[in-house]
Structure formats: structure tokens, C-alpha cells
Amino acid sequence: MHGNYTTLKEIVLQLEPPDPVGLHCNEQLDSSEDEVDELATQATQDVTQPYQIVTTCGTCSRKVRLVVQCTGTDIHHLHTLLLGSLDILCPVCAPKT
């Protein structure tokens, strides 16, 4: 609209509802693409690499550092264990147990 006052010429009414648009996609992936993605995921999980872990001693709360070599899946398992009931002991506290 232009100007200070509206006129009937400037008002546009749409009496018909808009056409519905289908939102479903009919495209399908080839099974070979799925297999390539799955193999790439497995390959990255099977590669072992070193991980440095810094945690605290379960007895005296000193900082403990260790390095492990494992796969990505295994480091996630270790992370879950460390968040649970698994405690790492420092060299000072280990002989006392």
C-alpha cells in the first residue's frame, strides 16, 4: 500500500486456498551408497590410535595420567567405565591395597 489511507483498489483478496504441496520425497538411495557409508564407519572405528587419559586417583584424588591404544568404540567403553564405578589408582596408593 502506498499513502496514508487504504483504498479498495489496494486490497487483494485471495478467495481460493493455495494449492497443497506434497512434502514427501520419492527419491531412494541405492543400496551401494548405504554399504559404502557403513564400511567407512566401520573402518574409522577399527583404526587404533593412542588416547591420553587424565583422571584422578580413586583414593587420594591426585592427578593420574595414562595413555592407551584402542579403537574409537573401545575408548567410549572406557569412558563409560570411568564415569561409573571404575577407579584408577596412582602409584602411591596402588601398593597400599
From Swiss-Prot:
It holds the Pfam family E7. GO terms for molecular function: DNA binding; DNA-binding transcription factor activity; protein domain specific binding; zinc ion binding. A zinc finger (unnamed) spans 57-93. It is found in: Host cytoplasm; Host nucleus. The keyword Repeat does not apply. Highly phosphorylated. GO terms for biological process: DNA-templated transcription; symbiont-mediated perturbation of host cell cycle G1/S transition checkpoint; symbiont-mediated suppression of host innate immune response; symbiont-mediated suppression of host type I interferon-mediated signaling pathway. Plays a role in viral genome replication by driving entry of quiescent cells into the cell cycle. Stimulation of progression from G1 to S phase allows the virus to efficiently use the cellular DNA replicating machinery to achieve viral genome replication. E7 protein has both transforming and trans-activating activities. Induces the disassembly of the E2F1 transcription factor from RB1, with subsequent transcriptional activation of E2F1-regulated S-phase genes. Interferes with host histone deacetylation mediated by HDAC1 and HDAC2, leading to transcription activation. The E7 terminal domain is an intrinsically disordered domain, whose flexibility and conformational transitions confer target adaptability to the oncoprotein. It allows adaptation to a variety of protein targets and exposes the PEST degradation sequence that regulates its turnover in the cell. Homodimer. Homooligomer. Interacts with host RB1; this interaction induces dissociation of RB1-E2F1 complex thereby disrupting RB1 activity. Interacts with host EP300; this interaction represses EP300 transcriptional activity. Interacts with protein E2; this interaction inhibits E7 oncogenic activity. Interacts with host TMEM173/STING; this interaction impairs the ability of TMEM173/STING to sense cytosolic DNA and promote the production of type I interferon (IFN-alpha and IFN-beta). This is Protein E7. It comes from Human papillomavirus 44. The gene is E7.
